[in-house]
Amino acid sequence: MDSTNSKREFIKSALEANINRRAAVSLFDRFGGSSAVFEKQFQDAQHAVRAHGALKREAELGTLVRKAGQRFEALKRERSILRQPRDLPRVADIDALVDAVADLKEEVAVRLDALEENGEETPTHSSSEIKDTIVRWRLDDLPPVCPETP
């Protein structure tokens, strides 16, 4: 989320997903789950939710990559400051860093694969899955409740 445009796109997708979810819930209440209008809105809402989720995951991946890059640059600067051989980091520290970078690289690859898979799938939904999704969306829209309410 570096540029202003990507932040705007993220906010736009969040609003679009929320509006589409609310419209789908409203159409379900008004016309029922077997209505063509509801089915179209439900598909659009799920597409918007998936698109927003993909943007969210991309932002998280960008943050991970940026953090790994910052960590690498910090260690590189530290290493350049340490000129004496006795002041160099131990081999165990370097091995730990290499392992951490490999783990981050693996995690990024897994998440990128998941992003690619999520973008291509067009699942079919049963009526119970649709009803469960509608109930979950209704619960998401409820206002928060204070745990200390008497």
UniProtKB/Swiss-Prot annotation:
One Pfam family this sequence matches: DUF848
InterPro entries xref list: DUF848
Domain of life: Viruses
Protein name: Protein ORF35
Gene source species: Human herpesvirus 8 type P (isolate GK18)
